[in-house]
Amino acid sequence: MLKLLSIQQNEIQTEDHYIINNELDDLLNKELVELFLKANDCIDDENFLEAVEFYDLILKIDPKNISALIDKGVTLQILGRIKLSIRSFNKALELSPKNIDALINKGSALHLSEQYLDAIACYDEALEIDQKCSMALAYKGLSLGELGNLTESISCFKRALSIDKHCTLAQISKDTAQELLKSINPNSKKL
C-alpha cells in the first residue's frame, strides 16, 4: 500500500513538474520573442550596438539559440566587427553544421576580410546541402570575381538567376562581370 501511495505521489509530482516546466517554457519563449522584437526595432533604427546587446541577452537565456547567433553575427558584420561575426557564425555552425544561413553569412564575412577561398568553401558547403541556393551561388560568384575568375563568376550568377530570376545581386553582378570581361577582352562575345 505504501509503495502504491509513493508511486501516486511521484506521478502527481511529475505531472506538477511538467505543468510548471511548461509554464516556465512559455514565459521564457515570450521573453525571447520580446527580446528579438526589441533587437529588430534597433536594427530598423540602425542602432546596431543596442541590437547586439539584445542578442547577448537572448544568448544569456538560451546559449544555443541559432537565430540569435546568426543575427548577432550579421549585426557585428554591419558594425565592421568581422572577426567577432565569424566567431558568432562558427558557434551557430557548431550547433547546426548544415545551417545554410550561417554558412552563407560566414562566407560573406570571410569575403569582407578578403579570405575569398575560405568564403567559397562556405558557399560550396551550402550548395552541397541545397544545390538550388541562389544566394550561395551569387555570393560564390562575387568571391570568384574578386579572384579574377570572371568567366566562372558569370556562370555562378547565371545559375543563380536560373533558380531565382529576381535575384538582384546575381543580375547586377553578372552585368558588371560581363562589362569587366568585355573591357579586358573587347573581342569576347557576351557570356
Model-derived regions: residue spans:
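Alpha-helical segment of the N-proximal tetratricopeptide repeat
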Residues: 28-61, 67, 74-78
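Helix-start (N-cap) detector for alpha-helical repeat units in TPR-like alpha-solenoids
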Residues: 32, 66-67, 100-101, 134-135, ...
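Conserved structural position within tetratricopeptide repeats
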Residues: 57-60, 90-94, 124-128, 161-162
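Position-specific recognition of the canonical hydrophobic site in helix A of tetratricopeptide repeat
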Residues: 43, 70, 77, 104, ...
